[in-house]
A protein has these predicted regions:
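N-terminal topogenic membrane-targeting module
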Residues: 1-36, 41
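Hydrophobic (often cysteine-bearing) scaffold residues that line and stabilize catalytic clefts
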Residues: 23, 52, 118-122, 188
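Active-site recognition of the HExxH zinc-binding catalytic motif
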Residues: 20, 120-137, 192
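Generic beta-strand structural signal
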Residues: 78-79, 102-104, 122
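Metalloprotease/metallohydrolase-associated module, dominated by Zn2+-dependent proteases
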Residues: 35, 39, 54-74, 85-116, ...
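Short, charged early-sequence alpha-helical segments and their helix-coil boundaries
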Residues: 42-53
Length: 213
């Protein structure tokens, strides 16, 4: 029910608690559609509850809530696979999540941590769905240039990244508190990390990177 959704989101999703009531309501309208279009699969014996689905769906929908097209942006997206913790290890480090355009994989431990704290700049679900938005562009590539509301906005962002990305790589590790320097890995990761920061540390991000914001 809508009341149950509200209670679950209020208890688990910090970004939801910060939203005005009208946006909360608009988000709750999107959630059942998202849940219904996605194939959900628990890995390594992980059991996915309805509450988990609602919370993940909410965070997946937040980035498209105000975009023209809304859920249509996820038209090619198909499935979510959830692991208890890390997906795998790479060079001794755990992989918390990944995305390939049609599928997202999430480590629940890290997804839950990102939901609960809406001000630390870390949000695994939003990060991975920023990649899905990126993949949904006309070229089908995750290259840090998603499809914006208009062609001119898309071109402006493409030019901005082309002109400034080397500066991002140099500066991300220096006195930067608004988002993870993992964003300097490539243009796609910059877009995903910037999207996390836009929602989690908006004021700080705007102060440090006003043009990107």
């Amino acid at each position: 029910t809508d009341d149950a959704q509200h209670d679950w989101l209020n208890a688990n999703v910090s970004l939801y608690r910060r939203m005005p009531a009208d946006l909360q309501e608009a988000l709750r309208v999107m959630i059942p559609e998202f849940i219904g279009k996605v194939r959900w699969r628990g890995e390594e014996g992980f059991m996915i509850t309805e509450e988990m689905k609602v919370c993940i769906a909410a965070e997946a929908c937040i980035p498209v809530l105000k975009l023209r097209g809304g859920m249509e942006i996820y038209r090619r997206f198909e499935s979510i696979e959830i692991f208890p913790e890390d997906l795998s290890k790479v060079n001794g480090r755990g992989v918390a999540g990944d995305a390939n355009g049609r599928r997202v994989r999430l480590g629940w431990r890290w997804a839950k941590e990102g939901m609960n704290d809406g001000e630390d700049g870390y949000n695994l679900v939003i990060h991975e769905f920023a990649h899905i938005i990126d993949f949904a562009s006309l070229d089908g590539k995750a290259d840090g240039v998603p499809q914006f509301n208009s062609y001119s906005e898309t071109r402006d962002w493409e030019k901005f990244v082309a002109q400034n990305y080397e500066d991002f790589q140099r500066e991300l590790g220096r006195n930067n508190e608004s988002f993870d320097d993992y964003g300097s890995s490539n243009e796609a990761e910059f877009f995903a990390c910037a999207t996390e920061s836009f929602y989690e540390r908006g004021a700080q991000f705007n102060q440090e990177w006003p043009e990107s914001y």
